[in-house]
C-alpha cells in the first residue's frame, strides 16, 4: 500500500528535483527508506500520537537527515523550517479569512480548549496543564510534547523549533480582537510551552 504523501515529503521531493536533479532519485530513495524505518520504530505508538508522528514529526526528521547529505546542517534545518512555515502561512490566511465572519472570533479560545483535549492530550503524548479555559481565555502549560520528545530522541532537538514557530505564524494576528501569547516552548529550551489565546 502506497503511503500518503505529507506536505513535508512533497516539499522535500520538490527541493531535490529543483536543486539536486542528478541525485534526486537517490535522495528520494534515502528519504523513503529512512521514513519507513522511523515509522516501523514507532509502530506501537497510540493512534492519537501516530497522527502527529505520520503527518509532521517523522517526515520532518527524515527530510532533515536526508538533506544533510547534500547541504550543511544549518541549511537543511532552514529548508525544513521553510516547508513548515509555508504551511503555517497558508493556515493563517485561511483562519484569518474565516474570522471575517462577524463574532466568530469569540469562539476561538473555546475551539482551542476542545482541540487540546482531543488532539493534544495525554493519549497523543502531550501533558497539558489547564490554567484557564473559559470566559474567552484558553491558557495551558504544555509540560510534555511528542514533537520535542521525538526530535530529542532522534538527536535533532533543534528541529522542534520549526513546529514551535509554526504555531506563532499560524495564530499571531488572526483577528484584531484575538491575542495569541507564548513566551516559552520546550523546543526552544524552556521547561514548558505557555500557550494562551484570549479575546481582547
Where on the chain are the PLM-derived regions?
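Amphipathic interaction/junction segments at domain boundaries or subunit interfaces
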Residues: 55, 66-155, 159
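Secondary-structure boundary/capping signal
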Residues: 24, 75, 178-179
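Unusually extended, aromatic-enriched hydrophobic runs near protein termini
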Residues: 49, 98-125, 173-198
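Generic structural motif
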Residues: 3, 126-130, 180
